[in-house]
Amino acid sequence: MRSYKLIAPAKINLYLEIIGDRPDGYHELVMILQSIDLADEIEIHSLSSETIRVHCNHPQVPTDKSNLVYRAAELMATKFPEAFAKYGGVDITVHKHIPVAAGLAGGSTNAAAVLVGIDLLWNLGLTQTELEELGSILGSDVPFCVAGGTVIATGRGEQLSPLPNLDHIYIVLGKYRSLEVSTAWAYKTYRQEYGSTYLRDTNDLASRAAAVHSGSIVKAIVEKDAVAIAQKLHNDLEKVVLPSYPQVLQLRELFASQPSVIGTMMSGSGPSVFALCENQAQAEQVQQQVRQTIPDEDLELFVTRTITHGIQVLGNE
Protein backbone atom coordinates (compact mmCIF):
# COMPACT_ATOMS: atom_id res chain seq x y z
CA MET A 1 0.00 0.00 0.00
CA ARG A 2 1.57 3.28 -1.13
CA SER A 3 1.88 6.34 1.09
CA TYR A 4 3.45 9.79 1.23
CA LYS A 5 4.41 12.10 4.07
CA LEU A 6 4.34 15.85 3.40
CA ILE A 7 5.20 19.07 5.22
CA ALA A 8 2.59 21.84 5.02
CA PRO A 9 3.96 25.26 6.11
CA ALA A 10 1.90 28.10 7.55
CA LYS A 11 1.84 31.57 6.00
CA ILE A 12 1.81 35.12 7.27
CA ASN A 13 0.81 38.30 5.47
CA LEU A 14 3.54 40.92 5.25
CA TYR A 15 1.08 43.19 3.44
CA LEU A 16 -2.71 43.14 3.06
CA GLU A 17 -4.58 45.93 1.30
CA ILE A 18 -8.27 45.77 0.42
CA ILE A 19 -8.80 47.79 -2.75
CA GLY A 20 -12.25 46.89 -4.06
CA ASP A 21 -15.26 44.61 -4.33
CA ARG A 22 -15.64 41.67 -6.71
CA PRO A 23 -18.79 40.45 -8.49
CA ASP A 24 -18.36 37.05 -6.77
CA GLY A 25 -18.76 38.63 -3.32
CA TYR A 26 -15.07 38.48 -2.42
CA HIS A 27 -12.74 41.48 -2.20
CA GLU A 28 -10.06 42.69 -4.58
CA LEU A 29 -6.84 42.38 -2.59
CA VAL A 30 -3.16 43.15 -2.88
CA MET A 31 -1.16 40.97 -0.50
CA ILE A 32 2.39 39.88 0.11
CA LEU A 33 2.33 36.33 1.43
CA GLN A 34 5.23 34.59 3.14
CA SER A 35 5.78 30.94 4.08
CA ILE A 36 7.11 30.24 7.57
CA ASP A 37 8.80 27.27 9.20
CA LEU A 38 5.83 26.45 11.46
CA ALA A 39 4.22 23.50 9.69
CA ASP A 40 1.79 20.59 9.89
CA GLU A 41 2.62 17.05 8.79
CA ILE A 42 0.28 15.20 6.44
CA GLU A 43 0.33 11.44 5.83
CA ILE A 44 -1.58 10.07 2.85
CA HIS A 45 -2.10 6.33 2.33
CA SER A 46 -3.88 4.62 -0.53
CA LEU A 47 -6.94 2.49 0.26
CA SER A 48 -8.26 -0.51 -1.61
CA SER A 49 -11.81 0.88 -1.52
CA GLU A 50 -13.06 4.10 -3.14
CA THR A 51 -13.42 5.97 0.14
CA ILE A 52 -11.92 9.07 1.75
CA ARG A 53 -10.94 9.00 5.42
CA VAL A 54 -9.52 11.89 7.43
CA HIS A 55 -7.93 11.76 10.90
CA CYS A 56 -6.47 14.58 12.97
CA ASN A 57 -4.75 14.83 16.36
CA HIS A 58 -6.44 18.18 17.15
CA PRO A 59 -9.90 18.01 18.78
CA GLN A 60 -11.08 21.25 17.12
CA VAL A 61 -10.42 20.00 13.60
CA PRO A 62 -13.38 18.17 12.00
CA THR A 63 -12.76 15.03 9.97
CA ASP A 64 -15.91 15.13 7.85
CA LYS A 65 -16.76 16.98 4.62
CA SER A 66 -16.54 20.34 6.38
CA ASN A 67 -12.75 19.89 6.50
CA LEU A 68 -10.88 21.42 3.56
CA VAL A 69 -8.62 18.36 3.56
CA TYR A 70 -11.61 16.12 2.86
CA ARG A 71 -12.86 18.50 0.17
CA ALA A 72 -9.41 18.51 -1.48
CA ALA A 73 -9.45 14.72 -1.73
CA GLU A 74 -13.05 14.79 -2.96
CA LEU A 75 -12.10 17.35 -5.62
CA MET A 76 -9.29 15.13 -6.89
CA ALA A 77 -11.63 12.12 -7.00
CA THR A 78 -14.17 14.16 -8.99
CA LYS A 79 -11.62 15.64 -11.39
CA PHE A 80 -9.75 12.36 -11.96
CA PRO A 81 -12.38 9.57 -11.65
CA GLU A 82 -10.32 7.05 -13.65
CA ALA A 83 -7.35 7.45 -11.29
CA PHE A 84 -9.68 7.24 -8.29
CA ALA A 85 -11.11 3.98 -9.63
CA LYS A 86 -7.66 2.60 -10.50
CA TYR A 87 -5.72 3.53 -7.36
CA GLY A 88 -8.54 3.53 -4.80
CA GLY A 89 -9.38 5.98 -2.06
CA VAL A 90 -7.13 7.75 0.43
CA ASP A 91 -6.58 7.71 4.17
CA ILE A 92 -5.29 11.10 5.36
CA THR A 93 -3.81 11.88 8.78
CA VAL A 94 -3.16 15.49 9.78
CA HIS A 95 -0.64 16.13 12.56
CA LYS A 96 -1.40 19.72 13.63
CA HIS A 97 1.31 22.10 14.81
CA ILE A 98 -0.10 25.28 13.24
CA PRO A 99 -2.66 26.95 15.56
CA VAL A 100 -6.25 26.45 14.45
CA ALA A 101 -8.38 29.38 13.21
CA ALA A 102 -5.40 31.69 13.48
CA GLY A 103 -5.09 33.59 10.19
CA LEU A 104 -2.12 31.39 9.25
CA ALA A 105 -3.76 29.35 6.45
CA GLY A 106 -3.57 26.09 8.42
CA GLY A 107 -6.56 24.53 6.67
CA SER A 108 -5.46 25.81 3.27
CA THR A 109 -1.93 24.45 3.56
CA ASN A 110 -3.28 21.05 4.64
CA ALA A 111 -5.53 21.03 1.56
CA ALA A 112 -2.58 22.00 -0.64
CA ALA A 113 -0.59 19.08 0.77
CA VAL A 114 -3.43 16.71 -0.08
CA LEU A 115 -3.49 17.95 -3.69
CA VAL A 116 0.27 17.40 -3.99
CA GLY A 117 0.13 14.03 -2.22
CA ILE A 118 -2.71 12.61 -4.30
CA ASP A 119 -1.02 13.83 -7.49
CA LEU A 120 1.96 11.66 -6.51
CA LEU A 121 -0.12 8.77 -5.18
CA TRP A 122 -2.15 8.51 -8.38
CA ASN A 123 0.76 9.27 -10.77
CA LEU A 124 -1.14 12.18 -12.31
CA GLY A 125 1.95 14.23 -13.22
CA LEU A 126 0.27 17.59 -12.64
CA THR A 127 2.28 20.79 -12.98
CA GLN A 128 2.51 23.31 -10.14
CA THR A 129 0.25 25.65 -12.15
CA GLU A 130 -2.36 22.91 -12.51
CA LEU A 131 -2.20 22.19 -8.77
CA GLU A 132 -2.60 25.91 -8.03
CA GLU A 133 -5.64 26.08 -10.32
CA LEU A 134 -7.21 23.15 -8.47
CA GLY A 135 -6.37 24.87 -5.21
CA SER A 136 -8.20 28.03 -6.26
CA ILE A 137 -11.43 26.01 -6.40
CA LEU A 138 -11.00 25.16 -2.71
CA GLY A 139 -9.99 28.55 -1.32
CA SER A 140 -8.09 31.77 -1.91
CA ASP A 141 -5.00 30.77 0.12
CA VAL A 142 -4.59 27.26 -1.29
CA PRO A 143 -2.73 28.23 -4.51
CA PHE A 144 -0.15 30.15 -2.48
CA CYS A 145 0.25 27.24 -0.08
CA VAL A 146 1.08 24.97 -3.02
CA ALA A 147 3.72 27.41 -4.28
CA GLY A 148 5.08 28.87 -1.05
CA GLY A 149 8.01 31.22 -0.65
CA THR A 150 7.36 34.96 -1.02
CA VAL A 151 4.72 36.21 -3.47
CA ILE A 152 2.45 39.10 -4.34
CA ALA A 153 -1.13 37.83 -4.47
CA THR A 154 -3.89 39.78 -6.22
CA GLY A 155 -7.52 39.17 -7.20
CA ARG A 156 -9.04 37.39 -4.21
CA GLY A 157 -5.57 36.07 -3.45
CA GLU A 158 -5.32 33.37 -6.09
CA GLN A 159 -3.30 35.33 -8.71
CA LEU A 160 0.34 34.84 -7.72
CA SER A 161 3.46 36.71 -8.78
CA PRO A 162 6.68 35.36 -7.21
CA LEU A 163 9.10 37.68 -5.42
CA PRO A 164 12.73 36.98 -4.47
CA ASN A 165 12.75 34.48 -1.63
CA LEU A 166 13.16 35.67 1.94
CA ASP A 167 14.99 33.20 4.15
CA HIS A 168 15.87 33.24 7.84
CA ILE A 169 14.03 36.34 9.02
CA TYR A 170 13.11 35.31 12.55
CA ILE A 171 9.58 35.64 13.84
CA VAL A 172 7.81 35.41 17.18
CA LEU A 173 4.21 34.36 16.68
CA GLY A 174 1.46 34.62 19.29
CA LYS A 175 -2.12 33.32 19.31
CA TYR A 176 -4.69 32.81 22.07
CA ARG A 177 -5.98 29.23 21.74
CA SER A 178 -9.55 30.11 22.72
CA LEU A 179 -9.77 33.21 20.54
CA GLU A 180 -11.17 33.09 17.01
CA VAL A 181 -11.92 35.88 14.55
CA SER A 182 -14.36 35.16 11.75
CA THR A 183 -12.74 36.02 8.42
CA ALA A 184 -16.18 36.68 6.94
CA TRP A 185 -17.00 39.06 9.81
CA ALA A 186 -13.69 40.93 9.42
CA TYR A 187 -14.15 41.54 5.68
CA LYS A 188 -17.86 42.35 6.04
CA THR A 189 -17.14 44.87 8.80
CA TYR A 190 -14.34 46.43 6.76
CA ARG A 191 -16.72 46.79 3.79
CA GLN A 192 -19.33 48.47 6.02
CA GLU A 193 -16.83 50.94 7.49
CA TYR A 194 -14.47 51.59 4.58
CA GLY A 195 -16.34 50.48 1.43
CA SER A 196 -16.70 54.08 0.30
CA THR A 197 -12.93 54.17 -0.32
CA TYR A 198 -12.95 51.13 -2.66
CA LEU A 199 -11.69 51.53 -6.20
CA ARG A 200 -14.39 50.85 -8.81
CA ASP A 201 -12.57 50.94 -12.14
CA THR A 202 -10.64 47.85 -13.26
CA ASN A 203 -7.79 50.03 -14.54
CA ASP A 204 -7.53 51.70 -11.13
CA LEU A 205 -7.42 48.28 -9.45
CA ALA A 206 -4.62 47.16 -11.76
CA SER A 207 -2.73 50.41 -11.21
CA ARG A 208 -2.93 50.05 -7.43
CA ALA A 209 -1.65 46.48 -7.56
CA ALA A 210 1.19 47.60 -9.85
CA ALA A 211 2.05 50.43 -7.44
CA VAL A 212 2.50 47.96 -4.58
CA HIS A 213 4.60 45.72 -6.84
CA SER A 214 6.95 48.61 -7.57
CA GLY A 215 6.74 50.09 -4.07
CA SER A 216 8.98 50.29 -1.04
CA ILE A 217 8.10 46.99 0.67
CA VAL A 218 8.88 44.99 -2.48
CA LYS A 219 12.12 46.96 -2.87
CA ALA A 220 13.00 45.98 0.71
CA ILE A 221 12.20 42.32 -0.05
CA VAL A 222 14.39 42.39 -3.17
CA GLU A 223 17.21 43.87 -1.08
CA LYS A 224 16.50 41.38 1.76
CA ASP A 225 16.43 44.32 4.18
CA ALA A 226 14.57 42.97 7.22
CA VAL A 227 14.42 46.32 9.01
CA ALA A 228 12.94 48.08 5.97
CA ILE A 229 10.42 45.25 5.48
CA ALA A 230 9.41 45.52 9.13
CA GLN A 231 8.79 49.25 8.77
CA LYS A 232 6.46 48.70 5.80
CA LEU A 233 4.22 45.96 7.25
CA HIS A 234 0.57 46.76 6.54
CA ASN A 235 -2.77 45.05 7.18
CA ASP A 236 -6.07 46.87 6.52
CA LEU A 237 -8.00 44.35 8.64
CA GLU A 238 -6.28 45.61 11.79
CA LYS A 239 -8.58 48.66 11.54
CA VAL A 240 -11.62 46.52 12.39
CA VAL A 241 -10.15 43.60 14.36
CA LEU A 242 -7.96 45.44 16.89
CA PRO A 243 -10.76 47.68 18.27
CA SER A 244 -13.02 44.63 18.70
CA TYR A 245 -10.48 42.21 20.18
CA PRO A 246 -8.54 43.77 23.10
CA GLN A 247 -6.35 40.68 23.58
CA VAL A 248 -5.06 40.96 20.01
CA LEU A 249 -4.36 44.67 20.48
CA GLN A 250 -2.62 44.03 23.82
CA LEU A 251 -0.37 41.37 22.31
CA ARG A 252 0.49 43.59 19.35
CA GLU A 253 1.36 46.50 21.66
CA LEU A 254 3.47 44.23 23.88
CA PHE A 255 5.42 42.96 20.87
CA ALA A 256 5.92 46.55 19.68
CA SER A 257 7.33 47.56 23.07
CA GLN A 258 10.16 44.99 22.93
CA PRO A 259 13.53 46.58 22.00
CA SER A 260 14.51 43.61 19.79
CA VAL A 261 11.31 43.73 17.70
CA ILE A 262 11.80 45.57 14.39
CA GLY A 263 8.14 45.31 13.33
CA THR A 264 4.87 43.69 14.39
CA MET A 265 1.46 43.08 12.81
CA MET A 266 -1.63 40.88 12.87
CA SER A 267 -1.60 38.13 10.23
CA GLY A 268 -4.58 37.92 7.89
CA SER A 269 -7.87 38.38 9.71
CA GLY A 270 -6.19 37.36 12.96
CA PRO A 271 -6.10 36.68 15.76
CA SER A 272 -2.43 35.70 15.35
CA VAL A 273 0.10 38.49 15.81
CA PHE A 274 3.72 38.22 14.70
CA ALA A 275 6.88 40.16 15.47
CA LEU A 276 9.97 40.32 13.25
CA CYS A 277 13.44 40.09 14.80
CA GLU A 278 16.91 40.26 13.28
CA ASN A 279 18.14 36.93 14.66
CA GLN A 280 17.05 33.81 16.51
CA ALA A 281 18.51 34.83 19.87
CA GLN A 282 16.52 38.07 19.84
CA ALA A 283 13.35 36.22 18.86
CA GLU A 284 13.78 33.76 21.73
CA GLN A 285 14.39 36.66 24.12
CA VAL A 286 11.16 38.35 22.97
CA GLN A 287 9.25 35.09 23.37
CA GLN A 288 10.54 34.74 26.94
CA GLN A 289 9.74 38.36 27.83
CA VAL A 290 6.20 38.15 26.46
CA ARG A 291 5.64 34.87 28.31
CA GLN A 292 6.73 36.51 31.57
CA THR A 293 4.44 39.49 30.97
CA ILE A 294 1.44 37.37 29.90
CA PRO A 295 1.73 34.05 31.79
CA ASP A 296 -1.71 32.97 30.51
CA GLU A 297 -1.41 29.37 29.27
CA ASP A 298 -4.08 30.15 26.67
CA LEU A 299 -1.46 32.19 24.79
CA GLU A 300 0.61 30.08 22.41
CA LEU A 301 4.01 31.53 21.48
CA PHE A 302 6.27 30.21 18.73
CA VAL A 303 9.70 31.18 17.42
CA THR A 304 9.84 30.49 13.70
CA ARG A 305 11.40 31.95 10.54
CA THR A 306 10.67 32.72 6.92
CA ILE A 307 11.30 29.92 4.42
CA THR A 308 11.53 29.63 0.64
CA HIS A 309 9.19 26.74 -0.14
CA GLY A 310 5.59 25.58 0.01
CA ILE A 311 4.53 21.94 0.30
CA GLN A 312 7.45 19.54 0.71
CA VAL A 313 7.43 15.78 0.23
CA LEU A 314 9.37 14.03 2.99
CA GLY A 315 9.20 10.58 1.50
CA ASN A 316 7.10 7.68 0.34
CA GLU A 317 6.62 4.02 1.14
From Swiss-Prot:
**Is Phosphoprotein given among the entry's keywords?**
no
Annotated pathway: Isoprenoid biosynthesis; isopentenyl diphosphate biosynthesis via DXP pathway; isopentenyl diphosphate from 1-deoxy-D-xylulose 5-phosphate: step 3/6
EC identifiers of the protein: 2.7.1.148
Q: Which domain of life is it from?
A: Bacteria
Which InterPro entries does this one have?
GHMP_kinase_C_dom, GHMP_kinase_C_sf, GHMP_kinase_N_dom, IspE, Ribosomal_Su5_D2-typ_SF, Ribsml_uS5_D2-typ_fold_subgr
Under Pfam families, the record lists: GHMP_kinases_C, GHMP_kinases_N
Q: Where does ATP bind?
A: 99-109
Enzyme class of the recorded protein, top EC level: transferase
Q: Name one GO molecular function term.
A: 4-(cytidine 5'-diphospho)-2-C-methyl-D-erythritol kinase activity
Catalytic activities: 4-CDP-2-C-methyl-D-erythritol + ATP = 4-CDP-2-C-methyl-D-erythritol 2-phosphate + ADP + H(+)
Q: Which UniProt keywords apply?
A: ATP-binding, Isoprene biosynthesis, Kinase, Nucleotide-binding, Transferase
Q: Which SUPFAM superfamilies match?
A: GHMP Kinase, C-terminal domain, Ribosomal protein S5 domain 2-like
Q: Name one GO biological process term.
A: terpenoid biosynthetic process
Active site location: 11, 141
Which purpose does this protein serve, as stated in its record? Catalyzes the phosphorylation of the position 2 hydroxy group of 4-diphosphocytidyl-2C-methyl-D-erythritol.
Family statement: Belongs to the GHMP kinase family. IspE subfamily.
Q: What protein am I looking at?
A: 4-diphosphocytidyl-2-C-methyl-D-erythritol kinase
Q: Which organism is it from?
A: Trichormus variabilis (strain ATCC 29413 / PCC 7937) (Anabaena variabilis)
